[in-house]
């Protein structure tokens, strides 16, 4: 059997004898070389790749031959002489592994120890825990329980019948019957009554002092209000007098300004009129003087009237014109 024509298919098996190691077809039941029968120890062979064949070799146009094989894991095409894939190192012929479902960890399920446990009918389990069926029930017989209860009751009675002479139980009664003459029990009542009286007196004194202080505080407040009202009235009267004096001074200033305005209105006309000595002018002056010596109210009314002011100005102008004509 030449190596060129040797092809491994699925199901072929290897002889379990290490010296032989012959690869047999899947249909053989015994080794073809040593004659040893096929057993469960015989490992199955698996092809890691398949030959591409003549058709694919022709399509490659001389790049690959018909004996070249294609890897099943990475689909790489390898030469026929390679026993492993050039890309993923998958063997061309590999041993078929048994599918046991194990994870493949260290010593997994190889030497598993199964401890056989027998369920006992005892009260406690192997870990020392009380079983559920015995938790709410009394395990011992009723006679044992009664004996235990009797012993406990006897022990309590013995404790009660012990001598109590060593304990001084009557000391409290002796203390209650002791003489109380050394204690002044009535003094506390008298002190309480005295304290109450002193408190009442202090309260009455504080109230009277409070009323006096309030009356005193009210009297200066009333005097203050009176002084304030007086100061306000005096200030109002002063302000009124000041306003009247200001009005009078203003009226006097306005009168003097009107007089000065009249005197300075026509200086040339006055010069002309002074040169002319007319009897009419003298009469007017005498009339104005007599009016000035009279009542001030009449003088104010005459000075304020615009018609008379206009007449006097026209008269002065006529006198000036007459004097100028005489000079000519």
Swiss-Prot record:
Q: Which residues carry this modification: Phosphoserine?
A: 9, 120, 153, 181, 188, 193
Locations of Low complexity compositional bias? 211-224, 232-242, 313-328
**Any one annotated GO CC term:** nucleus
Subcellular location as annotated: Nucleus
Residues bearing the modification N6-acetyllysine: 18, 54, 92
| Stretches with biased composition (Basic residues) | 196-210, 251-271, 297-312
Q: Which PANTHER family match?
A: ZINC FINGER RAN-BINDING DOMAIN-CONTAINING PROTEIN 2, ZINC FINGER RAN-BINDING DOMAIN-CONTAINING PROTEIN 2 ZRANB2-RELATED
Please explain the role this protein plays, according to its UniProt record: Splice factor required for alternative splicing of TRA2B/SFRS10 transcripts. Binds to ssRNA containing the consensus sequence 5'-AGGUAA-3'. May interfere with constitutive 5'-splice site selection.
Domains (record comment) = The RanBP2-type zinc fingers mediate binding to RNA.
Name assigned to this protein? Zinc finger Ran-binding domain-containing protein 2
Gene (UniProt):
ZRANB2
